[in-house]
């Protein structure tokens, strides 16, 4: 019986993996600035980039790119909508929606890996990822604001659903086209 161990063949966090995560962190930051201001929560394209991160980077890497985004925001880098940053933006009433980006990317990626990366498969994965994000964010908002859950959902989610449908359709279309190209190029 040999006691020799297998040679080390590489890290889960290779330079390529870290670079792709950094690119998607930057993409979320840029898409966060493309915004339409509304009273409660601004509409922006951040979730569009979150869906792409989940669908293209898969669960853990997609979530990692969002963890880095939140860490940058927490230390004050102005990566959030309206060039805001700082811990106060993450722990306020609507901070749960931003923290929910991590879960949205993870679940979108998990379901995309499990079901496949065709357009309709990605649409369903992104809808469920969005639902996880919205559940987490609405629960957070409800607890901090003292508003009942369904009232919070009606105020903070329902008005944004039409835009989310468009974001999901565009992100699924783009991801279903990009994934084979990125795989052929060895980037994923």
Predicted regions and their residues:
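Alpha-helical transmembrane segments and their cytosolic interface
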Residues: 1-25, 155-188
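Hydrophobic transmembrane alpha-helices
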Residues: 2-63
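Short helix-perturbing small/polar motifs within transmembrane alpha-helices
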Residues: 3-8, 23, 30, 87-135
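Membrane-helix interface segments
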Residues: 14, 59-64, 115-121, 148-149
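Hydrophobic alpha-helical transmembrane segments
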Residues: 18-23, 48, 52, 62-68, ...
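Generic alpha-helical transmembrane segments of integral inner-membrane proteins
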Residues: 22, 26, 30, 52, ...
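Interfacial aromatic-anchored transmembrane helix boundaries in multi-pass membrane proteins
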Residues: 32-42, 70-104
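Interfacial helix-loop-helix junctions of multi-pass membrane proteins
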Residues: 77-83, 140-154
